[in-house]
């Protein structure tokens, strides 16, 4: 009898595994069929993450034949909404739309309730955008070379960002450290207060996304000096890159991506990836993304994973080397 049990045990294990795999496969083939699909925008309404999520909402609903809704769950630089998605059932009905803070939060917030790499699966990289270093139009800084000269002088140069640990803050720390420049960081509580002071000349320099800065450039109240990406921005084609300005290889883009809970069936991630890529190939959607200063990227889940991992590694070193802490 014991011999028979020992013989049956491996067979039972194989059978259980086959049932599990078959169940997951059937679930993936039937997706989407049972409920609303949620896109969790991990920042409050009105910002770029919210707007990106809402650009995806209606086209995805039409393509999938299933209701897709945006749910805003902001706070802690996107960590609260991301934690909710990481803890959601991996059934293809909950996704996160995240910002570049997702690549920084693991280094700034050691007590996160989720593992950014293990508990979430990248679906697609939506797009990237340059950060823009700008100054008041009446400022003494006419070019980025003027900023470099001031930052290398005893007095240094002050700049404002949307907050400590933001991509703008980390990019300026990386820039200063790589070239022996001294910058004084002035953190603000968001883009609105930052740009109000920058336009008024209360802070000499401001760094923010194209989405944040360009309206003030268009109104002639701000002068753009340089962008932080390796290529010029189509939205600010006359503004040089840091690479062109003597800092070869410097590339610090803002970015947006869609993630799923880990263990979401690969077939569902593949399908969602294909559907989002299809949305972004729509000329009208691409035009609306461009209006926000976002350069559409798209691509495979694996390409998104490689990009996000690289961002996490880059900024983890900057945070550690400069002892940067979140607000």
Predicted regions and their residues:
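Extracellular/periplasmic bilobal clamshell ligand-binding domains
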Residues: 300-326
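Bacterial N-terminal signal peptides that target proteins for export
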Residues: 1-12
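C-terminal lobe and pocket-closing loops
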Residues: 128, 213-282, 310-313
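Hinge/capping helix and adjacent helix->loop/strand transition within the periplasmic-binding protein
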Residues: 36-37, 87-93, 107-193, 242, ...
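Sec/Tat signal peptide C-region and signal peptidase I cleavage site
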Residues: 22-28
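Short coil/turn segments
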Residues: 42, 46, 100, 131, ...
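N-terminal (or domain-start) structured segment
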Residues: 28-118, 155-157, 164, 180-205, ...
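Bacterial N-terminal signal peptides
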Residues: 10-21
């Amino acid at each position: 009898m014991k011999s028979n049990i020992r013989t049956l045990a491996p067979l039972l294990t194989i059978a259980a595994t086959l049932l599990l795999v078959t169940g997951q496969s059937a679930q993936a083939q039937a997706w989407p069929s049972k409920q609303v699909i949620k896109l969790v925008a991990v920042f409050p309404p009105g910002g770029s993450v919210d707007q990106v999520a809402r650009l995806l909402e209606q086209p995805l609903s039409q393509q999938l034949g299933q209701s897709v809704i945006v749910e805003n769950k902001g706070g802690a630089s996107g960590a609260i909404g991301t934690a909710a998605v990481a803890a959601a059932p991996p059934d293809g009905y909950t996704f996160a739309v995240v910002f570049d803070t997702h690549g920084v939060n693991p280094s700034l917030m050691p007590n996160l309730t989720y593992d950014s790499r293990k508990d979430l699966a990248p679906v697609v990289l939506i797009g990237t955008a340059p950060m823009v270093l700008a100054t008041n139009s009446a400022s003494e800084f006419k070019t980025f070379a003027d900023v470099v000269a001031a930052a290398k002088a005893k007095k240094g140069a002050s700049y404002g960002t949307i907050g400590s640990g933001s991509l703008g803050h980390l990019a300026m720390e990386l820039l200063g450290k790589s070239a022996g420049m001294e910058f004084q960081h002035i953190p603000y509580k968001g883009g609105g207060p930052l740009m109000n002071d920058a336009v008024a000349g209360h802070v000499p320099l401001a760094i923010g996304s194209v989405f944040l800065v360009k309206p003030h450039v268009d109104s002639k109240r701000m002068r753009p000096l340089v962008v932080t990406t390796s290529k010029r921005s189509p939205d600010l084609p006359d503004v040089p890159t840091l690479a062109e300005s003597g800092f070869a290889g410097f590339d610090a883009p803002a970015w947006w991506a869609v993630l799923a809970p880990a263990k979401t069936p690969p077939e569902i991630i593949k399908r969602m990836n294909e559907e989002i890529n299809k949305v972004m190939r729509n000329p009208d959607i691409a035009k609306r993304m461009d209006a926000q200063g976002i350069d559409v990227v798209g691509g495979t889940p694996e390409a998104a994973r490689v990009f996000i991992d690289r961002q996490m590694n880059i900024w983890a070193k900057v945070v550690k080397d400069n002892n940067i802490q979140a607000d």
